[in-house]
């Protein structure tokens, strides 16, 4: 029986797809994409890599692997449980990237929203899977980058799936993000002392 856990455990090196210049990251992305196709099947529209890996600003020591899975319908309980198991197994096989892979499972209908959607989405980040994670001001910023730079791991051209984002909406979101998220962190010394977050400030 073809299961996602069997796929990620038994995949040979010759079947790894070169999505990026980094072989270990390609291993993670290939295992995740192949497992996700089995779990989500027809509910999965596409899986896309965006962020620094997609536009040439990736730092192996501090950058995250940013992904979004676009789905037709919100994940049901069965899909959620199987996706959790998939992420757990991939994390066990690739400890280096266990805490630095981020993936949202976003219904297609949400992409019509300019402001952060009211409904949460399943999200994996920092080695933890959240059944319901709210979007913040990063929503439209990430969607702008997604539209401009996305690399399809599964699915077609992102520009045929979501609409372009007006840059003025991105600028508004950046201002909101500055005051709502970043300004309070300037007095959070524990957060500032974390080298991973220091890199984000420098960006």
Placement of each model-derived feature along the sequence:
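Helical scaffold of the NTase/Pol beta-like nucleotidyltransferase catalytic core
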Residues: 2-48, 79-80
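Conserved NTP/Mg2+-binding pocket subregion across the NTase superfamily
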Residues: 4-21, 80, 85-200
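Catalytic metal-binding acidic patch
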Residues: 51, 56-85, 100-105
